[in-house]
Curated annotation (Swiss-Prot):
<feature type="repeat" description="TPR 1">
    <location>
        <begin position="35"/>
        <end position="68"/>
    </location>
</feature>
<keyword id="KW-0793">Thylakoid</keyword>
<dbReference type="InterPro" id="IPR051685">
    <property type="entry name" value="Ycf3/AcsC/BcsC/TPR_MFPF"/>
</dbReference>
<dbReference type="GO" id="GO:0009535">
    <property type="term" value="C:chloroplast thylakoid membrane"/>
</dbReference>
<dbReference type="Pfam" id="PF00515">
    <property type="entry name" value="TPR_1"/>
</dbReference>
<keyword id="KW-0677">Repeat</keyword>
<keyword id="KW-0602">Photosynthesis</keyword>
<dbReference type="GO" id="GO:0015979">
    <property type="term" value="P:photosynthesis"/>
</dbReference>
<feature type="repeat" description="TPR 3">
    <location>
        <begin position="120"/>
        <end position="153"/>
    </location>
</feature>
<comment type="similarity">
    <text>Belongs to the Ycf3 family.</text>
</comment>
<keyword id="KW-0472">Membrane</keyword>
<keyword id="KW-0150">Chloroplast</keyword>
<keyword id="KW-0934">Plastid</keyword>
<comment type="function">
    <text>Essential for the assembly of the photosystem I (PSI) complex. May act as a chaperone-like factor to guide the assembly of the PSI subunits.</text>
</comment>
<keyword id="KW-0802">TPR repeat</keyword>
<dbReference type="InterPro" id="IPR019734">
    <property type="entry name" value="TPR_rpt"/>
</dbReference>
<feature type="repeat" description="TPR 2">
    <location>
        <begin position="72"/>
        <end position="105"/>
    </location>
</feature>
Length: 168
């Protein structure tokens, strides 16, 4: 039984009902419908912290999905899971791949910046200020891109950019 039919969360149930209605109304191929079902089940598993199950669903959705825009969100969610698991290199790879397909994903730029900032803090703890500055500079570039896409969001990042004199 698909995960979306067994989930007890009200929001997930509502999303599933609306998604099922849309899938019936909007003309889509059976492959697109199946890809969306895997994507939806991946979201459900991810929201419950079942990352292995979510990844299986996302990989299957990627195999079936042909639309680059839709694939970008699948890739983004795979990146989120790798971020949550502390697999930052893999996460960055998936965020990059998502942005290749959809350059309007400010949340991907933000997450990439957070990872770079974290690596900068790690470098400081290890006593390597030169490497830390390089990571912080990279974080700044990603945050600038996120802010450019959605002005008014990422206020903490905006403040950090001003405080560290990285905002142009």
């Amino acid at each position: 039984m698909p995960r979306s039919r067994i989930n007890g969360n009200f929001i997930d149930k509502t999303f599933s009902i609306v998604a099922n209605i849309l899938l019936r109304i909007i003309p889509t191929t059976s492959g697109e419908k199946e890809a969306f079902t895997y994507y939806r089940d991946g979201i459900s598993a991810q929201s419950e912290g079942n990352y292995a199950e979510a990844l299986q669903n996302y990989y299957e959705a990627m195999r079936l999905e042909i639309d680059p825009y839709d694939r970008s969100y699948i890739l983004y969610n795979i990146g989120l899971i790798h971020t949550s698991n502390g697999e930052h290199t893999k996460a960055l790879e998936y965020y990059f791949r998502a942005l290749e397909r959809n350059s309007f994903l400010p949340q991907a730029f933000n997450n990439m910046a957070v990872i770079c900032h974290y690596r900068g803090e790690q470098a400081i703890r290890q006593g390597d200020s030169e490497i830390a500055e390089a990571w912080f500079d990279q974080a700044a570039e990603y945050w600038k891109q996120a802010i450019a896409l959605t002005p008014g969001n990422y206020i903490e990042a905006h403040n950090w950019l001003k405080i560290t004199r990285r905002f142009e």
